[in-house]
Curated annotation (Swiss-Prot):
Keyword Ribosomal protein part of the UniProt annotation: yes
Ribonucleoprotein keyword on record: yes
Name under which the protein is recorded: Large ribosomal subunit protein eL14
Lineage of source species: Archaea, Thermoproteota, Thermoprotei, Sulfolobales, Sulfolobaceae
Gene, per the UniProt record: rpl14e
CDD domains: eL14
Family assignment from sequence similarity: Belongs to the eukaryotic ribosomal protein eL14 family.
A GO MF label: structural constituent of ribosome
Length: 96
């Protein structure tokens, strides 16, 4: 089970959206992925994110590569994960 894969739900650990959950929509290269909230669910915009700034969860939805926000929202509703996505989490950031 790869931790970084399309459809994996992750928690953002850095930036203004830290603590919010997102879904991996596409893998850009070995360092970056494309994620979305979707924005109308938990205010996480579709953007490129460094994988070091993500903490994968054990939850995954079945979406196609490059799925639209509407498709992601529909799959989240089918899986019953809308309320899970709206809950913020305190990210585990190691102290340097």
């Amino acid at each position: 089970m790869p931790a970084i894969e399309i459809g994996r739900i992750c928690v953002k650990t850095r930036g203004r959206e830290a603590g919010k959950k997102c879904v991996i929509v596409d893998i850009i290269d070995e360092n970056f992925v494309l994620v979305t909230g979707p924005k109308d669910v938990n205010k996480v915009k579709r953007r490129r994110v460094n994988i070091l700034h993500l903490e994968p969860t054990d939850k995954k939805i079945d979406i196609n590569k490059g799925a639209s926000d509407d498709e992601v929202k529909k799959k989240l509703e089918e899986a019953g994960l809308i309320e899970f996505m709206k809950q913020d989490v305190k990210p585990k950031i190691p102290v340097i």
